[in-house]
């Protein structure tokens, strides 16, 4: 293969059969269970990277079911998102996500900088409630429940919340083990079509694990729970801060 061919074809690895395709990345009937809880503010400040700022001692714990996604297939994801500000702009910082499908793990890490790891999350309706779980290996590290569709939420307001900015810390090492890329990335959900939004009584239990430390941000109080269904496109990102250039 000629050098010019390598340059023109280079997108992702392996060169001749990339682990994930080029976008756009559209999700149909993407289902969320988002349980917002109050936690220890000191622990939040320890893990949220500057120039992001912690605004409230809150965490959004998310279980996301994605049965129909272009290029990524059928998978489920779970993890923690922290409300933050960047230069006065409110948004969410993704701390870690755990999922069960290689293409979105590879694509998420390489394209955007999503902090994704392989695990076994689930999200489904269990009789009268919606149930989210996360297993890391043989250990159950998260269990979330919410009464099924107890009360409708304003879908316009929920669409606005989904459309807000999201932030990621993208880290890619050089071949010598030093940081080659260390950037704060911002991205948005686009072309959102809300199909439903509900709330209800909720619970969240987090258990310690050395490699899936979701319990490091302890649940002190449940603040809000939302069950959402939407079609949306995962927009590509932009670098808002380069740690290596400063």
UniProtKB/Swiss-Prot annotation:
Catalytic activity entry: acetoacetate + H(+) = acetone + CO2
Catalytic center residues: 116 (schiff-base intermediate with acetoacetate)
Gene: adc
Family of the protein in this entry: Belongs to the ADC family.
EC number of this enzyme: 4.1.1.4
Protein name (database record): Acetoacetate decarboxylase
Pfam families the record matches: ADC
InterPro entries: Acetoacetate_decarboxylase, Acetoacetate_decarboxylase_bac, ADC_dom_sf
Sorted UniProt keywords: Decarboxylase, Lyase, Schiff base
Record Gene3D superfamilies: Acetoacetate decarboxylase-like (2.40.400.10)
Disulfide bridge map: none
Entry GO MF terms: acetoacetate decarboxylase activity
Functional description taken from the UniProt entry: Catalyzes the conversion of acetoacetate to acetone and carbon dioxide.
């Amino acid at each position: 293969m000629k050098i010019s061919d390598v340059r023109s074809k280079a997108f992702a690895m392996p060169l001749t059969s990339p682990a994930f395709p080029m976008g756009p990345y559209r999700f149909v009937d993407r289902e969320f269970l988002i349980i917002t809880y109050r936690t220890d503010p000191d622990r939040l400040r320890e893990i949220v990277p500057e120039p992001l700022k912690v605004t409230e001692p809150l965490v959004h714990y998310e279980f996301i079911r994605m049965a129909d996604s272009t290029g990524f297939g059928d998978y489920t994801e779970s993890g923690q998102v922290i409300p933050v500000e960047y230069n006065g702009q409110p948004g969410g910082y993704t701390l870690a996500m755990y999922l069960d499908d290689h293409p979105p793990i590879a694509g998420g890490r390489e394209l955007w900088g999503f902090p994704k790891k392989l695990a076994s999350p689930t999200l489904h309706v269990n009789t009268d409630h919606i149930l989210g779980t996360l297993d890391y290996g043989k250990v159950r590290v998260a269990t979330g429940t919410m009464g099924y569709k107890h009360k409708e939420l304003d879908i316009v307001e929920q669409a606005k919340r989904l459309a807000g900015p999201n932030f990621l810390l993208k880290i890619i090492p050089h071949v010598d083990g030093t940081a080659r890329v260390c950037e704060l990335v911002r991205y948005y959900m686009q072309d959102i079509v809300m199909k439903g939004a509900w709330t209800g009584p909720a619970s969240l239990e987090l258990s310690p694990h050395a490699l899936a430390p979701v319990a490091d941000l302890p649940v002190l109080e449940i603040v809000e729970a939302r069950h959402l269904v939407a079609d949306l496109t995962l927009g590509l990102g932009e670098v808002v801060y380069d740690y290596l250039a400063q």
